Regions:
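A preference for well-ordered globular domain cores
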Residues: 1-145
Length: 145
C-alpha cells in the first residue's frame, strides 16, 4: 500500500489572514474590505502619533488625525492608480510637449490615454462595488487596453 501526499492549496495572503493547522491544512480568514478607524481595547478612538512634547521633553503624542487601517478596497484602488500612472508615464511627454510648445498630441496617443483612464475609472468602480473578497479576487489590476 502506498500513499500519495496531497498538499492543500494555501489561501492567497493578499486576501486572507492565513494560519497553518497541525494537520497541514490551512485556515484563511478574509481581510477587511473597508477602511477601519482603530480603537483601543476600551473602545476609545486611536490617533496617529506625532513627535511633540510632554513636560518640556520630546515625546510621541496623539495628533488630531484618526488612526485608520486601510482595507483591501483602498489598497487595490491604490494599485490601480499606480498601474495607471506607470502606463500613462510612457506617453506623458506628449502632454508636456503640448503644454510647453503647443504641438498636438497624435490622435492614437490621445485615444490610448483616454482608454487607459477609462479602464482605471471602471476598475476603481468595480472595486468599490465588491462586497466579498471572492468578488475582489476576480478583478484584474493590470492595465488591459
Amino acid at each position: 500500500m502506498s500513499f500519495t501526499r496531497q498538499d492543500e492549496v494555501r489561501p492567497d495572503d493578499q486576501y486572507y489572514w492565513v494560519t497553518q493547522n497541525s494537520d497541514g491544512s490551512y485556515t484563511g480568514i478574509p481581510k477587511e474590505l473597508e477602511d477601519r478607524e482603530e480603537s483601543d481595547k476600551d473602545g476609545n478612538p486611536m490617533y496617529v502619533k506625532i513627535q511633540g512634547e510632554v513636560d518640556g521633553k520630546p515625546a510621541m503624542v496623539d495628533s488630531t488625525e484618526r488612526l485608520v487601517t486601510k482595507g483591501l478596497k483602498s489598497q487595490w484602488i491604490a494599485k490601480v492608480k499606480h498601474n495607471t500612472n506607470m502606463t500613462l508615464a510612457q506617453t506623458d511627454w506628449y502632454v508636456i510637449r503640448k503644454v510647453e510648445r503647443s504641438v498636438d498630441i497624435p490622435a492614437d496617443v490621445a485615444t490610448y490615454r483616454a482608454a487607459v483612464v477609462a479602464w482605471a475609472t471602471a476598475t476603481e468602480a468595480s472595486i468599490t462595488a465588491v462586497t466579498t473578497v471572492e468578488e475582489l479576487k476576480l478583478i484584474n489590476l493590470g492595465v488591459s487596453i
